[in-house]
């Protein structure tokens, strides 16, 4: 329609694998090229049935084959692409890849601690500044909600555990049947928060943040947590460690691991926590600013 010469078509995620070859050829006929962001391991997500997971995996293979460049948002995803698909590209070639992560906003919330919006939210949810652990994320099994709730219940912490998520009632019922968390007044499902300034302030005022994502590449909520919450407790997987490095504490999904870490975190001094926060913010400022990410995209698209 716009007669663009040498267009670059950037496809996000690996949904349309069966059509990838057709579109690749048509775009090349127009003098264009195809870039792909393979996203994370969608085929591993527990929310999908076995046939859908199989489709995602096959679709991923076809889309990696029929692209001119795969832009991976994680070093581990880039490594995975080569381990799985080297020699499986067009004419047996290896896929061409590059790494460009996500960015994060490092500015502090505009809300003060005595802002009426924040005060009312805390009052409604029964929470107090620096007296709650926090998690923000999709309510799906691969984000380790069962482990986080189970381990928090086993911990000796006197603090609350605030869970900001859009609850899936079926999954919630399954967790209650397994864990009986409703008997523990510290576990608080507090709904969703779409006001970004309020959410940012809630992050800043958390005693610590849990990140339990086990599937996918660089997760935006992890970068946001590192940029706003001083103390971060992350599940020990490659995707998380490549982002946070030594700026966070790590736990495994094994029984007792996170509970032990929570008890340790509760005993950390104010200075120790502040130092963790300083390192985390420095890490994000050096590697995950939008200026840096946008510059890398400009290089990929213009050069």
Residue spans for each PLM region:
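Glycosyltransferase donor-sugar binding loop
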Residues: 104, 136, 160-175, 188-192
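A short, active-site helix/loop in glycosyltransferases that binds the activated sugar's phosphate group
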Residues: 65-96, 104-109, 118, 144, ...
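An aromatic- and histidine-rich active-site surface loop
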Residues: 4-38, 217
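Conserved donor-binding/catalytic core segment of Leloir-type glycosyltransferases
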Residues: 122-143, 149-156, 162
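A short, well-ordered alpha-helix in the C-terminal region of glycosyltransferases
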Residues: 272-287, 296-299
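Conserved acidic donor-binding segment of nucleotide-sugar-dependent glycosyltransferases
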Residues: 248-256, 264-270
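Acidic donor-binding loop of glycosyltransferase active sites
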Residues: 201-217, 230-231
């Amino acid at each position: 329609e716009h007669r663009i010469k040498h267009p670059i078509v950037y496809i996000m995620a690996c949904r349309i694998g069966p059509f990838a070859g057709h579109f690749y050829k048509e775009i090349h006929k127009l003098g264009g090229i195809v870039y792909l962001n393979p996203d994370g391991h969608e085929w591993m997500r527990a929310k999908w049935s076995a046939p859908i997971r199989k489709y995602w995996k096959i679709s991923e293979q076809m889309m990696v084959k029929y692209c001119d460049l795969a832009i991976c948002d994680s070093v581990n995803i880039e490594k995975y692409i080569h381990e799985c698909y080297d020699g499986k590209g067009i004419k047996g070639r290896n896929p061409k890849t590059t790494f460009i992560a996500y960015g994060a906003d490092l500015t502090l919330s505009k809300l003060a601690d005595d802002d009426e919006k924040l005060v009312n939210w805390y009052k409604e949810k029964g929470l107090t500044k620096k007296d709650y652990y926090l998690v923000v994320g999709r309510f799906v099994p691969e984000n380790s909600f069962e482990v986080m709730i189970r381990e928090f219940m086993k911990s000796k912490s006197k603090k609350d555990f605030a869970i900001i998520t859009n609850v899936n009632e079926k999954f919630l019922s399954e967790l209650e049947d397994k864990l009986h968390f409703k008997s523990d007044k510290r576990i608080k499902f507090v709904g969703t928060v779409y006001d970004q300034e309020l959410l940012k302030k809630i992050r800043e005022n958390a005693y610590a943040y849990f990140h339990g994502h086990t599937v996918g590449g660089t997760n935006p909520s992890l970068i946001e947590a590192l940029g706003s919450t001083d103390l971060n407790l992350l599940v020990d997987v490659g995707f998380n460690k490549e982002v946070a490095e030594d700026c966070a504490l790590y736990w495994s999904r094994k029984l007792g691991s996170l509970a032990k870490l929570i008890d340790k975190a509760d005993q950390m001094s104010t200075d120790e926590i502040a130092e963790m926060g300083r390192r985390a913010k420095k890490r994000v400022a050096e590697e995950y600013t939008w200026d840096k990410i946008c510059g890398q995209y400009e290089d990929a698209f213009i050069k």
